[in-house]
């Protein structure tokens, strides 16, 4: 057992082990989670690697080669969206949109809110942060919820926008929409009412722990929306509707289906921007200025992404690692996609270029532990990372030397950059995340080689670290926060704060939901779904539903951080943590979007995040 000193010694899994323990989570909100590794009796650990004639028989996951070649990535061009002409037109459109927001919409409160929502949905709000905050602060201060003309739609929309921007709005405002006799939300199924129900559904996902009204709103709105979809689908006899099938009647059904698939709050903004722009263009009431502005901004930002990707691709090609190690997942494009999900702002190029390297190394080293390495080799690699000395390479098998050397150099280079910009040496924090990652990966390797089946608690205590969430978020903090604060550093000295734990746990559970079947087929250790099934005797579908329920509860814990006035972390970092949860749900929504190279994976990368295709 290895734990941080000075931290309460409890299992961080009390909130997710079963539904009866969820209420205990609130008592842990101010603590940091110690790093725990559930140890198996050493007498049960054996090395199942078989050696014949001095040749080690290794496992293979038979990963497919990458879809996206080096030459293809380097050929990407967005030259038509660079230069003074585009910049000048963008500035002109920005001024026009600002006038619409501040002048034309000023007298119509609801229209102004809808326009702000449109800016957020099309990933344009970052250009109007000051103006949006001024408008929302004014609306919050005058309590416009008292407006008798506010219906469910207007109330839910304003509630969502205010909560999204950190305002403490009471859930009590929705009580007026409950039935006076039953105290339940009134049933609404007409086309006009369904707009309000959809708005209530989206607002409910901003709920925090113990906010029962918002939980009731979620349950009620889901039931109502599902009934609406069933009735509309039966009436129209159209089992599925695509964006290309757009007309006024189909628009609401399309929006409802999209929302039920995954709420807006849980989606990554880049993919949603493309989806909404495509839909908005077909809207007969669309604003042509906003549409042109959204398209041009989108394509210009995409050109920045492509340069970042090409930079990362050249680094990867220079390492020659993809040529020398054929047993692991060569997934440069997918690794880059994670960085866009964490920080999509155009000015965050440094993060995408440097942290993309970390995602490549995480994937490579994960495959060494999961697939290729023997137990003895993995222990050597773990010890080398803990020593953090290039001389440790002498003790490693040849195939491990280059990954270790790349890791050592990359972390030290990133630490050097932080030292130069902030006069703070963070290498010990970055190193610690990698030591923890490797030790927890080693524990899973020991389980595999011994044939041990962990309990759900044993597995999840280990797996929220082995999934690499702490690596990703510790790096994001130091790469994207300037300046780092003394209070934050003091907290990080103790261990991983709740926001890192909760986001990492969502990453773990979404990963398992998307990948566990494939991993079980190749003989990996049981994942969260299988461990829960073994512990409780439930079916796979029931276990999957439980994991989805836990994800929902973890999101509530994340939402609590928005009102934690004692948090030393910036809103930017809290947003990065939320974005890790969002990009993980995007990647694993339809299976293993990180490892798989099927047509669906290719489509989601090329069309949704639109690193490849312009609008």
From Swiss-Prot:
EC number, as in UniProt: 4.2.3.115, 4.2.3.114
Top-level division of the source organism's lineage: Eukaryota
Residue numbers binding (2E)-geranyl diphosphate: 334, 371, 375, 513, 516
Residues in coiled coil: none
GO cellular-component term (any): chloroplast
Pfam families, alphabetized: Terpene_synth, Terpene_synth_C
CDD domains, alphabetized: Terpene_cyclase_plant_C1
Transmembrane domains' residue ranges: none
Residue sites binding Mg(2+) 3 per the record: 516, 520, 524
Pathway terms, separated by semicolons: Secondary metabolite biosynthesis; terpenoid biosynthesis
Catalytic reaction annotation: (2E)-geranyl diphosphate = alpha-terpinene + diphosphate; (2E)-geranyl diphosphate = gamma-terpinene + diphosphate
Cofactor (UniProt): Mg(2+); Mn(2+)
Keywords in alphabetical order: Chloroplast, Lyase, Magnesium, Metal-binding, Plastid, Transit peptide
Transit peptide: 1-33
Motif window: DDXXD motif: 371-375
InterPro entries linked to this entry: Isoprenoid_synthase_dom_sf, Terpene_cyclase-like_1_C, Terpene_cyclase_plant_C1, Terpene_synth_N, Terpene_synth_N_sf, Terpene_synthase-like, Terpene_synthase_metal-bd, Terpenoid_cyclase/PrenylTrfase
Cofactor binding notes: Binds 3 Mg(2+) or Mn(2+) ions per subunit.
Claim: Coiled coil is one of the keywords in the record: no
Enzyme class: lyase
Compartmental location: Plastid, Chloroplast
SUPFAM superfamilies: Terpenoid cyclases/Protein prenyltransferases, Terpenoid synthases
Main location per the UniProt record: plastid
Protein function: Involved in monoterpene (C10) olefins biosynthesis, constituants of cannabinoids and terpenoids-rich resins. Catalyzes mainly the conversion of (2E)-geranyl diphosphate to alpha-terpinene and gamma-terpinene.
Domain notes: The Asp-Asp-Xaa-Xaa-Asp/Glu (DDXXD/E) motif is important for the catalytic activity, presumably through binding to Mg(2+).
Similarity section: Belongs to the terpene synthase family. Tpsb subfamily.
Protein name: Alpha-terpinene synthase TPS33PK, chloroplastic
Species whose genome carries this gene: Cannabis sativa (Hemp)
Lineage: Eukaryota, Viridiplantae, Streptophyta, Embryophyta, Tracheophyta
């Amino acid at each position: 057992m290895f734990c941080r000193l000075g931290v309460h010694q409890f299992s961080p899994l009390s909130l997710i082990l079963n539904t009866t323990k969820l209420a205990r989570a609130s008592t842990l909100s101010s603590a940091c989670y110690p790093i725990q590794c559930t140890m198996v009796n050493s007498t049960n650990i054996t090395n199942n690697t078989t050696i014949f004639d001095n040749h080690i028989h290794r496992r293979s996951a038979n990963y497919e080669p990458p879809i996206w070649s080096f030459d293809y990535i380097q050929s990407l061009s967005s030259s038509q969206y660079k230069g003074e002409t585009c910049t000048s037109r963008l500035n002109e459109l920005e001024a026009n949109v600002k006038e619409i927001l501040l002048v034309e919409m000023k007298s119509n409160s609801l229209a102004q809110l809808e326009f702000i929502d449109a800016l957020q949905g099309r990933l344009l709000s970052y250009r109007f942060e000051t103006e949006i905050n001024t408008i929302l602060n004014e609306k919050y201060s005058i309590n416009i919820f008292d407006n008798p003309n506010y219906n469910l739609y207007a109330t839910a929309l304003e509630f969502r926008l205010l909560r999204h921007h950190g305002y403490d709005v009471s859930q009590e405002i929705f009580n007026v929409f409950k039935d006076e006799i039953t105290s339940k939300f009134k049933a609404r199924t007409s086309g006009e009412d369904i707009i309000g129900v959809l708005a209530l559904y989206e607002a409910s996902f901003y709920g925090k722990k113990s906010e029962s009204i918002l939980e009731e709103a979620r349950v009620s709105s889901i039931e109502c929306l599902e009934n609406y979809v069933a009735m509309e689908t039966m009436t129209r006899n159209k089992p599925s509707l695509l964006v290309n099938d757009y007309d006024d009647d189909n628009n609401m059904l399309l929006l409802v289906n999209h929302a039920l698939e995954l709420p807006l709050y849980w989606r990554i903004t880049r993919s949603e921007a493309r989806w909404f722009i495509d839909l908005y263009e077909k809207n007969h009431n669309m604003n042509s200025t906003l549409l042109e502005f959204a398209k041009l901004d989108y394509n210009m930002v995409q050109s920045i992404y492509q340069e970042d990707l090409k930079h990362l691709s050249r680094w990867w090609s220079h390492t020659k690692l993809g040529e020398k190690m054929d047993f692991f997942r060569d997934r440069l494009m997918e690794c880059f996609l994670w960085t866009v999900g964490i920080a999509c702002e155009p000015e965050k190029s440094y993060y995408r270029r440097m942290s993309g390297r970390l995602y490549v190394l995480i994937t490579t080293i994960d495959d060494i532990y999961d697939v290729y390495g023997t137990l003895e080799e993995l222990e050597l690699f773990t010890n080398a990372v803990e020593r953090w000395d290039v001389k440790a390479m002498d003790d490693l098998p040849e195939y491990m030397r280059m990954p270790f050397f790349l890791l050592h150099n990359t972390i030290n280079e990133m630490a050097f950059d932080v030292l130069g910009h902030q006069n703070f040496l963070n290498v010990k924090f970055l190193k610690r995340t990698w030591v923890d990652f490797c030790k927890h990966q080693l524990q899973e390797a020991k389980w595999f080689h011994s044939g041990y089946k962990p309990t759900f608690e044993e597995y999840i205590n280990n797996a929220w670290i082995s999934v690499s969430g702490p690596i990703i978020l510790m790096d994001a903090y130091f790469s994207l926060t300037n300046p780092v604060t003394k209070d934050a550093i003091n907290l990080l000295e103790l261990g991983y704060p709740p926001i890192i734990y909760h986001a990492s746990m969502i990453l773990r559970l979404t990963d398992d939901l998307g990948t566990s079947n494939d991993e079980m087929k190749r003989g990996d250790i049981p994942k969260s779904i299988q461990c829960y099934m073994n512990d409780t005797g439930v079916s796979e579908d029931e276990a999957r539903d439980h994991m989805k329920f836990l994800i929902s509860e973890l999101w509530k814990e994340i939402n609590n951080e928005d009102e934690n006035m004692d948090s030393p972390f910036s809103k930017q970092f809290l947003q990065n943590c939320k974005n890790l949860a969002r990009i993980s749900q995007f990647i694993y929504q339809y299976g293993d979007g990180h490892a798989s190279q099927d047509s669906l994976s290719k489509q989601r990368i090329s069309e949704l995040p639109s690193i490849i295709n312009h609008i």
